[in-house]
């Protein structure tokens, strides 16, 4: 298992769609890009295809290669493979981080999540998500709070790891 993204942060988006990536996220992108060398721009893939999702999912090169290998293992022509190829190959954007640590988000991607002047980044293990801050608060935080409220007050989240194989 490689390095993981951790944390959350807000960043300004300029009129050209440029947004700074959290510095710690850049280190993970570098470490998870097998072709990266000091002085190079780390690569990543932004997946935007699922119309139900209100965020952009950003994959390290190692993470997307793992997904690609699993897709390739599915029977050619199967419904699952067709859907996954459309989302992860057709409706994704291979890109790089520029020399100042920014991503350029094309208008199409900004429009998909209604992103304007500010972006919210949140880690998700070997991926990270980019949200419109208000959407994250309304949708994701509300859902997380609802799920937590269903658990007993003394619940330890690490209990979810019991029986997770080697944990």
UniProtKB/Swiss-Prot annotation:
<dbReference type="GO" id="GO:0009295">
    <property type="term" value="C:nucleoid"/>
</dbReference>
<dbReference type="GO" id="GO:0000976">
    <property type="term" value="F:transcription cis-regulatory region binding"/>
</dbReference>
<dbReference type="InterPro" id="IPR003444">
    <property type="entry name" value="MraZ"/>
</dbReference>
<dbReference type="InterPro" id="IPR020603">
    <property type="entry name" value="MraZ_dom"/>
</dbReference>
<dbReference type="InterPro" id="IPR038619">
    <property type="entry name" value="MraZ_sf"/>
</dbReference>
<keyword id="KW-0805">Transcription regulation</keyword>
<comment type="subunit">
    <text>Forms oligomers.</text>
</comment>
<protein>
    <recommendedName>
        <fullName>Transcriptional regulator MraZ</fullName>
    </recommendedName>
</protein>
<dbReference type="GO" id="GO:2000143">
    <property type="term" value="P:negative regulation of DNA-templated transcription initiation"/>
</dbReference>
<dbReference type="InterPro" id="IPR037914">
    <property type="entry name" value="SpoVT-AbrB_sf"/>
</dbReference>
<dbReference type="Pfam" id="PF02381">
    <property type="entry name" value="MraZ"/>
</dbReference>
<keyword id="KW-0804">Transcription</keyword>
<dbReference type="GO" id="GO:0003700">
    <property type="term" value="F:DNA-binding transcription factor activity"/>
</dbReference>
<keyword id="KW-0963">Cytoplasm</keyword>
<comment type="similarity">
    <text>Belongs to the MraZ family.</text>
</comment>
<feature type="domain" description="SpoVT-AbrB 2">
    <location>
        <begin position="92"/>
        <end position="135"/>
    </location>
</feature>
<dbReference type="GO" id="GO:0005737">
    <property type="term" value="C:cytoplasm"/>
</dbReference>
<dbReference type="InterPro" id="IPR007159">
    <property type="entry name" value="SpoVT-AbrB_dom"/>
</dbReference>
<dbReference type="InterPro" id="IPR035642">
    <property type="entry name" value="MraZ_N"/>
</dbReference>
<dbReference type="InterPro" id="IPR035644">
    <property type="entry name" value="MraZ_C"/>
</dbReference>
<keyword id="KW-0238">DNA-binding</keyword>
<feature type="domain" description="SpoVT-AbrB 1">
    <location>
        <begin position="8"/>
        <end position="51"/>
    </location>
</feature>
<keyword id="KW-0677">Repeat</keyword>
């Amino acid at each position: 298992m490689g390095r993981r993204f951790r944390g959350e942060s807000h960043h300004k988006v300029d009129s050209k769609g440029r947004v700074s990536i959290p510095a710690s996220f850049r280190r993970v992108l570098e470490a998870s890009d097998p072709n990266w060398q000091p002085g190079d721009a780390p690569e990543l893939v932004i997946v935007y295809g699922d119309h139900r999702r209100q965020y952009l999912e950003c994959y390290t090169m190692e993470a997307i290669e793992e997904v690609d290998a699993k897709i390739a293992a599915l029977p050619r022509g199967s419904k699952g493979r067709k859907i996954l190829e459309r989302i992860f190959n057709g409706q994704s954007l291979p890109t790089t981080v520029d020399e100042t640590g920014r991503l350029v988000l094309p208008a199409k991607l900004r429009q998909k999540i209604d992103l304007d002047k500010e972006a919210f980044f949140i880690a998700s293990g070997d991926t990270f998500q980019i949200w419109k801050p208000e959407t994250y608060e309304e949708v994701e935080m509300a859902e997380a709070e609802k799920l937590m409220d269903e658990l007993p007050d003394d619940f330890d989240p690490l209990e979810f790891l019991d029986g997770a194989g080697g944990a």
